């Protein structure tokens, strides 16, 4: 009966996520909100509710090599997607190849997978997600872009110091590192502070989904849809193969495996379209690819969550 309740909870929460996404889209279509409002929500999520959700999941950790596995997989998953993007566009010009590297890579863990997992699984599970997203964030914030820039233009345009500055200007990444340090040192944040941060942390799933609904765009032609579907298929088939290796062969505990698998099926990072523009792309493909990946991911995450609690 307990499993049935959990499965029903997963289904209702997934439906709730879709409804909140639709609510954001509906409000935008009725001109009650705008694209700019979505950007405001994105700022709130990245700088307030997501860091608070991370702090609220703080638990003591004993260092072991297995702790590095989710972190390494967060980096490796990105590099694998970079390679797939490069190989599937090897006959395109350099700029298109560079854009293909960056606009289908990265995992939207902080504003999608983590809120989903936060709503469905126990808080103690979230730390594996944080470990994965620490590695993922390093690649999403700058790593993938530098690889794409190398492909498109043959050289990096940024110094090492500017890369480090960019990485540490990310509040979620700094919060991840702070939480990991505290957990490994077995330090705890006073409960009075956690009582305050949990207010914002608990709001993270709702605000993140409302933000996504406000930012998504469904205006895609039939030909564009099939092109995008093909590219997403490459992404999710590759991640499916990696997820199978993680689940059946990687020597770590079951909870860590399950959380990493869920992260591997997260949507494309929201930085994908931003980096495509920075490379010089004028195509809306990166934004459309990002939108479709959200709906594919919520379906896959729901199915996987049901399997994990069955």
Predicted regions and their residues:
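Alpha-helical transmembrane segments of multi-pass small-molecule/ion transporters
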Residues: 1-310
